[in-house]
Amino acid sequence: MKMWLLFSLLVIISFKTCLSEFTWHRRYGHGVSEEDKGFGPIFEEQPINTIYPEESPEGKVSLNCRARASPFPVYKWRMNNGDIDLTSDRYSMVGGNLVINNPDKQKDAGIYYCLASNNYGMVRSTEATLSFGYLDPFPPEERPEVRVKEGKGMVLLCDPPYHFPDDLSYRWLLNEFPVFITMDKRRFVSQTNGNLYIANVEASDKGNYSCFVSSPSITKSVFSKFIPLIPLPERTTKPYPADIVVQFKDVYALMGQNVTLECFALGNPVPDIRWRKVLEPMPSTAEISTSGAVLKIFNIQLEDEGIYECEAENNRGKDKHQARIYVQAFPEWVEHINDTEVDIGSDLYWPCVATGKPIPTIRWLKNGYSYHRGELRLYDVTFENAGMYQCIAENTHGAIYANAELKILALAPTFEMNPMKKKILAAKGGRVIIECKPKAAPKPTFLWSKGTERLVNSSRILIWEDGSLEINNITRSDGGVYTCFVENNKGKANSTGTLVITDPTRIILAPINADITVGENATMQCAASFDPALDLTFVWSFNGYVIDFNKENIHYQRNFMLDSNGELLIRNAQLKHAGRYTCTAQTIVDNSSASADLVVRGPPGPPGGLRIEDIRATSVALTWSRGSDNHSPISKYTIQTKTILSDDWKDAKTDPPIIEGNMEAARAVDLIPWMEYEFRVVATNTLGIGEPSIPSNKIKTDGAAPNVAPSDVGGGGGSNRELTITWAPLSREYHYFNNFGYIVAFKPFDGEEWKKVTVTNPDTGRYVHKDETMRPSTAFQVKVKAFNNKGDGPYSLTAVIHSAQDAPSEAPTAVGVKVLSSSEISVHWEHVVEKIVESYQIRYWASHDKEAAAHRVQVASQEYSARLENLLPDTQYFVEVRACNSAGCGPPSDMTETFTKKAPPSQPPRIISSVRSGSRYIITWDHVVALSNESTVTGYKVLYRPDGQHDGKLYSTHKHSIEVPIPRDGEYVVEVRAHSDGGDGVVSQVKISGASILSPCLLGFLLPALGILVYLEF
């Protein structure tokens, strides 16, 4: 009895020790001795950097964390490497998400990460920063006014208030919200510091300016006190050279980001801004703003690193600025870890490699805790090595995580999941591999037998390291039963299969080479012998790729007449169909192949290596390399061009005019100066015109002086003491260089000396000359020519125009007003005798409005009355009339006052019956009583019209009823409204027809309500 108790105690102690050891292994990490479907945590959502607006009304912020695991994971959070006390009422958990109530900058700003764990291990999320965003208001102090001479450059400082983060956007208000300044070549708002730059100040810049700052991160905007800008007039503005005042600094950018460089110059005339990458072509993703002041490079790459230059130039001088863009890269995986199962006692090298700039360092976590740095190699693994591993690659720009679970396997050999095939087929003379793949850990030893004979390696037989059996040069005697025996320290197992030998597959009719022209057909023959017990399939491939006959049935067809025939028909062959065709005859056991080449003759392929050299104003030299002639000699080349003005390619004139097929250089001539071009080259042979080359890089031809004169020169009219000159602006293609503008020359018709003025806006077609001594309607000769930095163009034809007339000096007389209704009056007057009257202007305003808010109506000079509509009822109005012409309006007439009538009745007549009587309907309604502020009812208007039409017969009556004829066909509408001195009131209507007396809605409403007995007649 004592021995039995002692034995039981030892068993219990041993069981507890084993159980505790098993539990320790199961806490973090897992050894597998049987099928295991559980797994450790895998993150599906991780926290991200979050900015919480300090003024947010929400009062809480969430950091997300969600992992998939079996069993379900448990979550906890850490901040600045310290555990978060989730028992505090400031924190709560929703699933794995952390919710912070009433966030406090002093307590809650920091770095957070989430831990997810189950009995397979623990993983740590990526780190996320919680910060607090704010944008303070501008100081309340008034900003001093700025005075600048016209023609001089200037800067208005924004001086944004304290803020976080830095991603502000800037705009400037002019005089009031929301009138924002539009940026152009003369005005620029820097998104770096918010300042407003004006290259040269004009009189039109006068106003009050305010810097408007927005923070997209916290959706808040503020604006500064207004800054008065006062341009000081100059008799003549002085030109001065370009001076770059907005300069970009060296930039460190991450690969994939968008980079913005700013460059703006002061100067008079307004400088042109050009960008280039020093010694290298500009990135293909670079874009330059319309004004030229901003260069944006989208999705920047490592090869975009380099020195960038901005050059500003006007006709007084140029300025340059350079800085470097350094492109670095966030860590990116080259090779990372994945969930892995390894046999107990084996070695493991777990590769984890990342690239980036700077080169990332590698560190490891195991179950959420620091474990190792650099390469990870495990030797003679045990269950203690199981768990959740994380490889972290990090550089100065951030970190990336790769998570994986390591399971340790210890299993006796078993073929339950992957037994050997019961029947294995192999062709005589061929090769076969019989797989033996049991599940076992550690790796077992392998033995093979055929029948009762043990197999060993020989010249024909090879047992692979993974246990597979390879037999070469198969004979009929190799058929039989094969068994694979496996054993490790956990147990033994075996599996058996039968090898059956078949006849080999052989090509007996091989395809032969063919030579055709584009559009012709070709046939590739193919036939094979094979084991009659098997099914034969033919597979055709083209240049190594299997032909998909479903997708490519337009050009490829097969002959299915005979099982042993795999003939291929190629229809309407194109150049792309030239190449090597391979026929493969295959069964489930073996295959045999044969190939042939197809030559397709056709138009030439695209020329290559196109280069542009010796760029001049109207010509460029091109060189290229010969492309494929597709088996027919090239007879000539054609150069084609495309400009920014059109998307169409056009044949260019060349020198020589005909480019022979043996040439690889020519010159494109008769080009437009200072125009952006692309070029391509097309080859031709006797079989047609080939594909064009890849277009060249865009180039700009050299500048030249304009050689086209503006057209449609004319003008005249305008305000008093003005000479207005107009012309049709030259389109962009005729500018020929930068700083394009116009020189306008004019003189009195009989004068000797031409007066010349310069107009710098290339898009304008108008100039107004003001001269207080100019006489009205004076004849002038005018002409216009274009200019740029290369020189002047020819003058246009001379046109004769007249200066503006004087405004009329007389006021209209006998102005009278007739009140028509509550919303309309009629105004009439005596005409002005002066011949220079072109129109009359009637100004009118209500007594409660200011005269400055007066409405205006313009009528032709032949009219002596006007109707004013949409007036307010029962309101006093003031009216005056002026005579006008192109120079302006003359003095006003005496002011006349009048009162509009009271408003018409607002209540519609209530129709009480619609009764048929013989051949007519009698419509009856209640009397409308006007309110105290409405005009008295003087009668009623009745409109009798077909339904769906606006016109009909109008009746007037003082009664409360009317008789209308019965419609012969269709429905009619009877509209009734009260009439008064103030106009017509609101309408009531009823529908009638030859078949019914009331609309259904009125019939159902009126008869019960009024107790009217109506006889229906049909």
UniProtKB/Swiss-Prot annotation:
Database matches in InterPro entries: Contactin-1_2_Ig1, Contactin-1_Ig1, Contactin-1_Ig3, Contactin-1_Ig6, FN3_dom, FN3_sf, Ig-like_dom, Ig-like_dom_sf
KW Transferase (keyword) present: no
Domain of life: Eukaryota
UniProt keyword terms in alphabetical order: Cell adhesion, Cell membrane, Disulfide bond, Glycoprotein, GPI-anchor, Immunoglobulin domain, Lipoprotein, Membrane, Notch signaling pathway, Repeat, Signal
Keyword Ribosomal protein in annotation: no
Annotated Ig-like C2-type domain residues: 41-131, 137-223, 241-326, 331-407, 413-500, 504-601
SMART domains for the chain: FN3, IG, IGc2
Disulfide bonds: 65-114, 158-211, 263-310, 352-391, 436-484, 526-583
Propeptide: 1000-1018
Gene3D superfamilies: Immunoglobulins
Protein location: Cell membrane
Positions glycosylated per UniProt: 208, 258, 338, 457, 473, 494, 521, 591
Molecular-function annotations in GO: cell-cell adhesion mediator activity
Membrane topology annotation: Lipid-anchor; GPI-anchor
Residue ranges constituting the Fibronectin type-III domain according to the UniProt record: 606-704, 709-806, 811-906, 907-1000
Family: Belongs to the immunoglobulin superfamily. Contactin family.
Identification of the protein by name: Contactin-1
Species of the source: Bos taurus (Bovine)
Gene responsible for this protein: CNTN1
